[in-house]
């Protein structure tokens, strides 16, 4: 097989590179390594800063499992380890041989200081990576959101370059990409639908999360499979010291987390659950027809770990979530995600660290019609099984090498309609589609000098369409050209791609730098939707004989400047992203139950470019940020608008977000957000006619119109319980849409009932002002 030969060549090149560069640095240096943990809980700390100063000065950060490694010559050094919310650890060390130094940081609660970042104070200036943001969990808990439920995805949409797919929607667009072009990972497992209650909530329970990182551009080579961004979310490992309880009770939802040790300092667990209870209020409704209806979601995060010995640690984590919507004796609808990750961390030696992961991910939905004589059930699902092997090798203080490979087996069940005997509905089963996605990568973080840093790498990916079903080909007009059945195990067609990645920074001084990056990304799984917002019933397809991988090349350039002793951050980034093999459907296409959906697809290209400005205050009683995005996103298809470029649905030229958090005294925290964006690009009718007594419309150019601009002000206040008590609690009071703005959710056109010859536009709004209150506790 072509891939196996290329993979062997790839591994050989890695081996030669390792041997060559290792020999260069295997002189008189010794290795200092260890793991950074919280002294209170034993939780490993991601991105903790480790600095060594003495005869030389070097620094690094702990990886996703708290591990760090540095190469230094023999001598006496001062070691400093810092992480936000923890007291800085300082120790004088003597290096005479390879050494291991694990560090337990003590929590430090300074009530007069609220901070936004968990990295070195000038990390944003000195690192080579650009277009990357880390969200602090405490900030997420302070930002006011809908119904008072703290939401990672809603907070994410307050950053420049990341735009909401709509009010009450967890979908988001990154630098002109579609909502399915974001790789969303929970403990390395992909999440296909990251929303609850049709998008009003995200799948991520912030109580269970310890780290959130988003890459908007120049994504590292270990990530692949999506065009626009990576959202890497990591769950808490669990408290290794003592058993604790944490939760909250709100107006429509409650949550509870339990964590503690199996064996103190060696293994731990974490279980966190949520459930809404809107259905409980329906049971009290005066209208008896509403009492049997169902509307709720639940989710459960669970994780356990066990340190087998000093070199091996085992992790098992999972997520299980479900939404249920039903009308009594008439209709039922449920959907949800399930993920599972089994990981083994292994330390080969003081410089080579590995992580092996077995991953599963499933998304499915079912729709039931319960009306007598018309009963039927519709079901659809996506199943992934993934094997990953990642290595990190500290070659020297100048080089940190990462390399690995992964394989993902995809199975899509597009849809099945089943019905009982006596139903008028015919049964239908659309054939499953199977695919095998393989990738290998290598990247090097290279500190060329004190001023110049590089992160460069290469990802080699392939996608093979697998047999087990019938595959057809279609011409440009959607007419069938051929049809053939392929047996299980047969390779129908394979696609191969090289994805180079490079990021570079030049440090002008301690507080200023300029950066540039380039990345090619490939996407093999594609979302089809008839609506402008994400929906639980959206259809995924994979590469086939007709559908090729989507491609994107992103070029970025930025200026970064810290002010006032690194208390303020400013950045300006510009980007340009051409896209190939973009997918649209023909006018009038209905995706539901469509057995030949590929016949209704057309292929074109896209482009996105823009400017992102970001100003952030990190420290002090008052902090927050201001983000502004000026951008343009367009698509071009030969069969749409005579082949002219048109506004993509993601196009919102102006987007502003303002976030403020104020610590007032020892117990009160006030926060507020303001958001503004250009209205959605939509298509309005330009004429109408009567057909069989019904009004029909002629529509203008694709997305040639806009809904009214969107803006909203939110506010929240948090009252902390009395300090220095073992039982901790707080009250959170919030107002969503404080000035009751009627933002457009949809625009409908209908005949004016008073003058049928006239057409009127009717705006539908989703939310007015919504108050919320939540009681949080921890003991």
Model regions and ranges:
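C-terminal beta-signal and adjacent terminal beta-strands/loops
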Residues: 667, 676-693, 708-714, 718-779
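Periplasmic N-terminal accessory/gating domains of Gram-negative outer-membrane beta-barrel systems
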Residues: 117, 121, 126-180, 186-219, ...
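Short, acidic, small-residue-rich periplasmic hinge/interaction motif at the N-terminus
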Residues: 37, 41, 48-53, 82-86, ...
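A beta-strand signature from Gram-negative outer-membrane beta-barrel systems
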Residues: 103, 158-159, 203-246, 255-257, ...
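Gram-negative outer-membrane beta-barrel transporters
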Residues: 575-578, 597-686
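Outer membrane beta-barrel strand-and-loop segments of large Gram-negative receptors
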Residues: 384-390, 429, 437-439, 542-548, ...
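Signature of Gram-negative outer-membrane beta-barrel scaffolds
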Residues: 407-511, 640-643
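Surface-exposed extracellular loop regions of Gram-negative outer-membrane beta-barrel proteins
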Residues: 364-365, 411-422, 464-478, 506-555, ...
């Amino acid at each position: 097989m072509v891939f196996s030969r290329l993979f062997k060549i790839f591994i050989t090149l890695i081996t030669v590179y390792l041997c060559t560069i290792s020999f260069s640095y295997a002189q008189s240096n010794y290795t200092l390594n260890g793991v950074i943990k919280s002294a209170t809980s034993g939780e490993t700390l991601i991105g903790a800063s480790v600095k060594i100063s003495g005869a030389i000065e070097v620094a690094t950060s702990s990886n996703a499992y708290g591990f760090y490694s540095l190469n230094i010559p023999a001598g006496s050094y001062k070691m400093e380890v810092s992480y936000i919310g923890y007291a800085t650890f300082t120790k004088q060390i003597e290096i005479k041989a390879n050494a291991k130094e694990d560090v337990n940081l003590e929590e430090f609660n300074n009530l007069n200081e609220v901070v936004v970042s968990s990295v070195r104070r000038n990390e944003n200036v000195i690192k080579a990576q650009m277009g990357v943001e880390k969200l602090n969990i405490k900030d997420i808990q302070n930002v006011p959101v809908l119904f008072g439920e703290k939401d990672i995805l809603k907070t994410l949409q307050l950053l420049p370059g990341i735009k909401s797919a709509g009010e009450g929607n967890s979908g988001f667009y990154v630098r002109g990409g579609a909502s399915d072009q974001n790789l969303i990972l929970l403990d390395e497992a992909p999440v296909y639908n990251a929303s609850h209650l049709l998008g009003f909530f995200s799948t991520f329970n912030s109580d269970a999360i310890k780290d959130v990182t988003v890459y908007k551009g120049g994504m590292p080579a270990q990530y692949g499979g999506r065009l626009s961004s990576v959202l890497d979310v990591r769950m808490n490992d669990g408290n290794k010291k003592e058993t604790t309880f944490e939760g909250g009770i709100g107006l429509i939802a409650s949550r509870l987390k339990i964590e503690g040790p199996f064996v103190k300092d060696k293994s731990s667990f974490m279980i966190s659950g949520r459930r809404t209870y809107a259905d409980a209020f329906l049971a009290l409704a005066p209208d008896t027809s509403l009492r049997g209806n169902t509307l709720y979601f639940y989710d459960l995060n669970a994780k356990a770990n066990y340190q087998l010995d000093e070199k091996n640690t085992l992790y098992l984590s999972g997520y299980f979530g479900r939404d249920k919507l039903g009308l009594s004796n008439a209709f039922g609808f449920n959907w949800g995600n399930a993920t599972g990750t089994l990981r083994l961390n292994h330390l080969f030696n003081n410089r080579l660290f590995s992580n092996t992961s077995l991953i599963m991910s499933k998304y499915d939905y079912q729709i039931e019609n319960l009306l007598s004589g018309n009963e039927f059930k519709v079901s659809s699902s996506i199943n992934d099984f993934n094997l990953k092997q990642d290595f990190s090798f500290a070659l020297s203080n100048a080089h940190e090498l990462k390399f690995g490979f992964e394989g993902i087996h995809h199975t899509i069940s597009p849809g099945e309609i089943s019905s009982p005997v006596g139903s008028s509905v015919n049964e239908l089963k659309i054939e499953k589609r199977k695919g095998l996605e393989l990738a290998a990568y290598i990247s090097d973080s290279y500190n060329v000098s004190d001023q110049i840093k590089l992160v460069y790498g290469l990802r080699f990916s392939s996608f093979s369409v697998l047999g087990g079903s019938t595959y057809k080909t279609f011409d440009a007009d959607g007419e069938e050209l051929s049809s053939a059945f392929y047996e299980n195990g047969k390779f129908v067609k394979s696609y191969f791609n090289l994805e180079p990645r490079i990021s570079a920074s030049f440090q002008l001084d301690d507080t200023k730098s300029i950066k540039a990056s380039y990345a090619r990304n490939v996407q093999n799984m594609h979302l089809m939707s008839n609506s402008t917002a994400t929906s639980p019933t959206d259809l995924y397809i994979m590469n086939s004989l007709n559908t090729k991988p989507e491609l994107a090349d992103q070029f970025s350039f930025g200026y970064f400047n810290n002010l006032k002793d690194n208390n303020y951050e400013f950045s300006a980034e510009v980007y340009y992203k051409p896209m190939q093999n973009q997918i649209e459907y023909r006018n009038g296409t209905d995706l539901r139950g469509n057995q030949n959906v590929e016949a209704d697809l057309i292929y074109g290209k896209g482009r996105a470019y823009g400017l992102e400005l970001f100003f952030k205050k990190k420290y002090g009683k008052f902090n927050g940020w201001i983000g502004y995005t000026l951008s343009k996103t367009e698509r071009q298809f030969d069969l749409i608008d005579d082949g002219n470029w048109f506004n993509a649905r993601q196009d919102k030229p102006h987007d502003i977000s303002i976030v403020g958090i104020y610590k007032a005294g020892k117990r009160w925290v006030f926060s507020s957000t303001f958001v503004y964006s250009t209205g959605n690009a939509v298509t309005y009718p330009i004429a109408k006619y009567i057909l069989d007594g019904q009004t029909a419309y002629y529509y203008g150019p694709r997305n040639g119109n806009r809904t009214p601009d969107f803006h909203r002000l939110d506010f929240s206040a948090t009252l902390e319980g009395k300090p220095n008590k073992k039982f901790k609690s707080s009250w959170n009071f919030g107002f969503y849409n404080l000035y009751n703005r009627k933002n457009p959710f949809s625009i409908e056109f209908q005949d004016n009932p008073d003058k049928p010859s006239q057409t009127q536009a009717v705006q539908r709004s989703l939310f007015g002002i919504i108050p919320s209150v939540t009681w949080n506790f921890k003991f």
